[in-house]
UniProtKB/Swiss-Prot annotation:
It comes from the Eukaryota. GO terms for cellular component: membrane; plasmodesma. Residues 39-49 have a biased composition (Polar residues). It is found in: Membrane. This is RHOMBOID-like protein 4. It catalyses: Cleaves type-1 transmembrane domains using a catalytic dyad composed of serine and histidine that are contributed by different transmembrane domains. It comes from Arabidopsis thaliana (Mouse-ear cress).
Length: 394
C-alpha cells in the first residue's frame, strides 16, 4: 500500500449501469500505539465506478485530482521531523536509540517503543492534555494533537492508511468534502478522548482516519440506490472497523479517539457525501415528469445526522470545558479503550516519581508501582528525570 497503489481508479461498490473491479489491500490502522500496529493487513475488494447518463455518454460524477490528502501526509511528516528536532534526545535525555541520527535520535525504546520523542516533548508540541485544555484555556490542543505522532511506527501506519483510503475518496468527492470529513472527524475523536482519558497525553491522526472509514460506510447507505453489491461492501467495511476497534482495547491505545472519529465521520458522511439517486440520473433527460433529485429517505438521513452531529459537539464541548469526567457517568465505558487481563494492566495514570539528589547520586521512586532505583547523574535536566521516571514506572 503506497503511492503505487494510489494510482488505481477510484472504486467502491458496483454501480447499476456498468461495472469495473480492482483489488486493493487496506492496512489496519495503527491506531494510537504499538499495540495496534501489530494488526495484520485486511484485504478489501472494491468495485465502484462513475456511471454515465444514458444516450449521452457524459460522466455524471466528476473525477477530482487528489492533492489535499498528499498534502496532509507531508504536513504530518514535517510536524514529526520538527518534533524530533525539538526533542533533542542527546542533549535532554542522554539515553537514546539510534544515536547516529544525532539531534533526531529517538528516546530509549523502554520509554517509547514506537521510535519517537518523549511524552514531555509531545505535550510541549501540542499533545492532548486535558488539564491544559480545561484549566489552561488551551482548546487548540483538540486540533493540534491530530498532527502529532508518538513515533515512526505510529506515523508510518497512519499515513499509509490515510493515503490508501483518502486518495480514493478525494478522487470521488473532491478536496473540500474529504478535507472537512478528515478534520472534523479528528476534532470529534479528540473531544471523546478528552472526556474519558483524562490523565494521558494523546496524539495521532487515527481518529481522523477512522472518520474516513465512517464516511465510507454512511455514503453507501445515503446513496443506496446506485450500488448493486451493497451487502458485501458493508460487511467488509464493518469487519475492518471491528478488527481495528478490537485492537484498540489493548493497553496504551486511545480507542475513544477512534470511536469518536468514526462516529463523527459516519454522521458527516450522510451530510457531505450525499448524491442524486439512480432514478433521477436515469430519467432527468428523458420525456415526462422529472423525479426529485434526492429521495425522501436521503433527506431524512441528512437532517437527522446533521442535528445529532451539532447536538453532540455542543454537549461534548460544554461537558469538557465544565470539567466533566465521562467515566463518572458511564462506569463500564473504560473497557472500550482497555480490557485488563493477566498479561497487562490498564492503569493509565501518568508516571510520577519522588526524587532525591545527593551529590552525583539521584534516587528515584515510582509512586505508581513502588519501584526504586539510583542513578549516577550530576545535575540531570527535567527531561532526563522525566525519562527515567517513565522507564521506572513501566
Amino acid at each position: 500500500m503506497g503511492e503505487k497503489d494510489s494510482e488505481t481508479a477510484p472504486i467502491w461498490g458496483k454501480t447499476r449501469e456498468r461495472e469495473r473491479s480492482n483489488n486493493n489491500n487496506i492496512q489496519p490502522m495503527d491506531l494510537e500505539s504499538s499495540s495496534s500496529v501489530s494488526g495484520q493487513q485486511r484485504s478489501l475488494t472494491q468495485s465502484r465506478s462513475s456511471y454515465e447518463e444514458r444516450g449521452r455518454g457524459v460522466k455524471e460524477f466528476r473525477s477530482w485530482f487528489p492533492w489535499l490528502i498528499p498534502c496532509f501526509v507531508v504536513a504530518n511528516v514535517a510536524v514529526f521531523v520538527i518534533t524530533m528536532y525539538v526533542n533533542n534526545c542527546p542533549k535532554k535525555s542522554g539515553d537514546c536509540f539510534a544515536d547516529f541520527l544525532g539531534r533526531f535520535s529517538f528516546q530509549n525504546t523502554r520509554e517509547n517503543p514506537l521510535l519517537g520523542p518523549s511524552s514531555l516533548t509531545l505535550q510541549t508540541m501540542g499533545g492532548l492534555d486535558v488539564k491544559k485544555v480545561v484549566k489552561g484555556d488551551e482548546g487548540w490542543r483538540l486540533l493540534s494533537c491530530n498532527w502529532l505522532h508518538g513515533g515512526v511506527v505510529h506515523l508510518l501506519m497512519n499515513m499509509l492508511t490515510l493515503l490508501f483510503i483518502g486518495i480514493r475518496m478525494e478522487r470521488e468527492f473532491g478536496f473540500i468534502r474529504i478535507g472537512l470529513l478528515y478534520l472534523i472527524s479528528g476534532f470529534g475523536g479528540s473531544i471523546l478522548s478528552a472526556l474519558f482519558l483524562r490523565s494521558n497525553i494523546s496524539v495521532g491522526a487515527s481518529g481522523a482516519v477512522f472518520g474516513l472509514l465512517g464516511g465510507m460506510l454512511s455514503e453507501i447507505f445515503i446513496n443506496w440506490t446506485i450500488y448493486s453489491n451493497k451487502v458485501v461492501t458493508i460487511v467488509t467495511l464493518v469487519l475492518i472497523v471491528a478488527v481495528n476497534l478490537g485492537l484498540g482495547v489493548l493497553p496504551g491505545v486511545d480507542n475513544f479517539a477512534h470511536i469518536g472519529g468514526f462516529a463523527t465521520g459516519f454522521l458527516l458522511g450522510f451530510v457531505l457525501l450525499i448524491r442524486p439517486h439512480y432514478g433521477w440520473i436515469n430519467q432527468r433527460n428523458g420525456p415526462g415528469a422529472k423525479p426529485h433529485r434526492f429521495k425522501i429517505y436521503q433527506g431524512i438521513l441528512w437532517t437527522i445526522s446533521l442535528l445529532i452531529l451539532v447536538a453532540g459537539f455542543i454537549v461534548g464541548l460544554i461537558s469538557l470545558f465544565n470539567n466533566v469526567d465521562g467515566n463518572e457517568h458511564c462506569s463500564w465505558c473504560h473497557y472500550l479503550s482497555c480490557v485488563p487481563t493477566s498479561k497487562w494492566s490498564c492503569n493509565r495514570e501518568p508516571a510520577s516519581c519522588t526524587t532525591t539528589q545527593l551529590g552525583n547520586q539521584l534516587s528515584m521512586t515510582c509512586l505508581r508501582n513502588g519501584k526504586s532505583a539510583s542513578y549516577i547523574l550530576a545535575n540531570p535536566s527535567d527531561s532526563r528525570i522525566n525519562s527515567l521516571c517513565v522507564q521506572l514506572c513501566r
